[in-house]
UniProtKB/Swiss-Prot annotation:
Highest classification ranks of the organism: Eukaryota, Viridiplantae, Streptophyta, Embryophyta, Tracheophyta
Protein name, entry field: Cation/calcium exchanger 2
Any Gene Ontology CC annotation: endoplasmic reticulum
Alphabetized Pfam families for the sequence: Na_Ca_ex
This protein's record includes keyword Transport: yes
Transmembrane segment boundaries: 10-30, 86-106, 131-151, 167-187, 203-223, 224-244, 331-351, 362-382, 393-413, 416-436, 480-500, 506-526, 531-551
Length: 559
């Protein structure tokens, strides 16, 4: 169903968005930025907060020395300690609520915008399903982990790299142990058989990836060429899959490619469904369903949609009006014009983030962004049709959607890592353990829902696809997502090497990850490649043992 966006609703949305932007800009201009706030804050140690025992003294410490550099747009520590001295529970509740919203933003942006742009680009470039499956669509499926890893390594607070490392390792452990384990237990009565060649290939490549990462951690440093070599292992994996499918008739490779396509269409954030997609349609369509007062169920559904629409409007509106979308079922000319107009304005705001808003340089950047936005909006309005998306010059539209969806994903991941780091200081928990658990679980819960649903409802083929996806995803996250982060960080330090502090506990997590792979290998081969309860229970025990050990170590450090 195409979008028939009403002009009145479009006007309301535009005015609302402009009011929000105006309030933000007004806040910047009416509160001059101290130049000291723009200087790096790494010369002080934020961990000194633990020596203060009340909110008032912590707030005074933050204001006097300002020791905690936040990667995000908000200073969460000052927000809590300086505004909720008398209501600490309320402040902590608001931070956890914001954490859930950030997970929603990251997952929803990746699935609805980023993946959509990648799929459209693969069609426009006439990529074969083989190449598209292991490149663009893998990038879409692994987007949350990719951006979280990039932010951890490339952000201003370089000390958060352990968050990125633990997130990738924790997510890989969760998917290969918990997700595969639950699938195996759920299918133990069906005695589903897994394709041998594909399983061996994925296990071998994953073990090679884990071994390479362990060597990097043990050595403690890596240069640009070493990081590039680590990342290029994923290119070797892609080439192996493609060649196996093209020349060897490898059905396992074909199943893996199909799994990536299915995951690309099924993988969605946990907060997205139950009406959110329909609410977003209601935002752009400007339609309200006429309900019969005598039909309680229909009236309940209407009000449910309305409440969810109102709650999600502040989250969805900025993205709707800054990310170009040109798909057949979501086309709206007013929204398209608005998105290409506001997108440069948003980019100019991000470019000026660390500048003093009233400076001459910031004003020039804002002026350039506004002029480019007006020009693009005029061109879009003059060259597009009201009812159908553009057929010519489609690449610039898709490239714009890709860039802006990537921008929003990076913003969400940046805030997520910044908030988790702050929560670590607030509760005295290492940010790395939060990356290993909270961030890894949040990014991987979609894999659990998607793969389990596929395995239960799509027969033996669905089970094969689900299990293959449980190994293909972590391979991508380890080699490409983590690899490209290392490449970017090493490039900044080139020709010097970047130092990665050796974390024995991270090596322990890698050891448990290998133990899970070995257990799966031994049980499957002894059971003629059939999934079963023994395999699933063993994987869950391994994961719980790994998690329990890390938690006990963290509690011991706290005392």
């Amino acid at each position: 169903m195409g979008f028939s966006f009403s002009s009145n609703r479009f006007g309301y949305l535009t005015v609302t968005f402009l009011l929000v932007i105006s309030c933000l800009l007004l806040g910047f201009f009416t509160n001059p930025v101290d130049s000291s706030a723009l200087r790096p804050k790494s010369e002080h140690d934020c961990s000194a907060l633990k020596h203060f025992h009340d909110y008032k003294s912590k707030c005074a410490y933050l204001k006097s020395i300002d020791p905690c550099a936040s990667q995000g747009f908000f200073d969460y520590l000052s927000f809590l300690y300086c505004n909720f001295e008398g209501f600490p529970i309320l402040g902590q509740f608001l931070l956890f609520l914001w954490l859930l919203l950030l997970f929603y933003l990251l997952g929803h942006t990746a699935s609805e915008y980023f993946c959509s742009s990648l799929e459209s680009l693969s069609k426009l470039l006439n990529l074969s399903p083989t190449v598209a499956g292991v490149t663009l669509l893998s990038l879409g499926n692994g987007a949350p982990d990719l951006f979280a890893s990039l932010v951890s390594f490339m952000g201003e607070s370089k000390g958060t790299y352990d968050v990125g490392l633990n997130t990738v390792v924790g997510g890989s452990g969760f998917v290969t142990c918990v997700v595969v384990g639950i699938i195996s237990i759920s299918l133990h009565k069906r005695r589903v058989r897994i394709e041998r060649a594909a399983f061996i290939r994925d296990i071998c490549f994953f073990c090679a990836a884990i071994g390479s990462l362990a060597l990097i951690l043990v050595y403690g440093k890596i240069n640009f060429w070493g990081a590039l070599g680590f990342c290029s292992l994923y290119a070797v994996y892609v080439a192996f899959v493609v060649l196996s499918w093209r020349f060897g008739g490898d059905q396992g490779a074909e199943s893996d490619l199909e799994s990536i396509h299915k995951r690309g269409s099924l993988s969605e954030p946990i907060l997205q469904r139950d009406g959110l997609e329909e609410i977003e349609d209601g935002v752009v369509n400007g339609e309200h369903q006429i309900v019969d007062d005598d039909d309680d169920h229909q009236r309940y559904y209407y009000w449910k949609r309305l409440v969810i629409w109102a709650i999600t409007l502040p989250l969805n509106l900025p993205r709707i009006l800054t990310i170009p979308v040109v798909s057949e079922d979501k086309w709206s000319k007013p929204l398209a014009v608005a998105s290409v107009t506001f997108a440069p304005v948003l980019l100019s705001f991000l470019w000026n983030w660390k500048r003093k808003p009233t400076s001459f340089e910031a004003g020039v950047v804002y002026l350039i962004g506004c002029l480019i936005g007006i020009a693009l909006g005029f061109i879009a309005g003059a060259t597009t049709k009201k009812l159908t998306p553009p057929k010519k010059w489609l690449l610039p539209w898709l490239a714009g959607g890709f860039v802006m969806s990537m921008t929003w994903s990076y913003i969400s991941a940046q805030e997520l890592v910044a908030l988790l780091t702050s929560l670590g200081y607030i509760f005295g928990v290492s940010p790395s353990i939060l990356g290993l658990t909270v961030l890894a679980w949040g990014n991987s819960i979609g894999d659990l829902i998607t793969n389990l649903t596929m395995a239960l409802h799509d027969g033996n083929e669905g089970a094969q696809v689900a299990v293959s996806g449980c190994y293909a995803g972590p391979i991508f996250n380890t080699l490409f997502a983590l690899g490209i982060s290392l490449v970017g960080c090493a490039w900044e330090a080139y020709p010097l090497s970047i130092v990665i502090k050796t974390d024995p506990r991270l090596l322990e997590s890698l050891g448990f990850l290998v133990a899970g792979l070995v257990w799966s290998f031994l049980v499957l081969f002894s059971n003629r490649m059939r999934l079963g309860g023994v395999m699933g229970i063993g994987l869950l025990v391994i994961y719980l043992a790994s998690l329990s050990l890390r938690i006990m170590q963290t509690v011991g450090d706290a005392h």
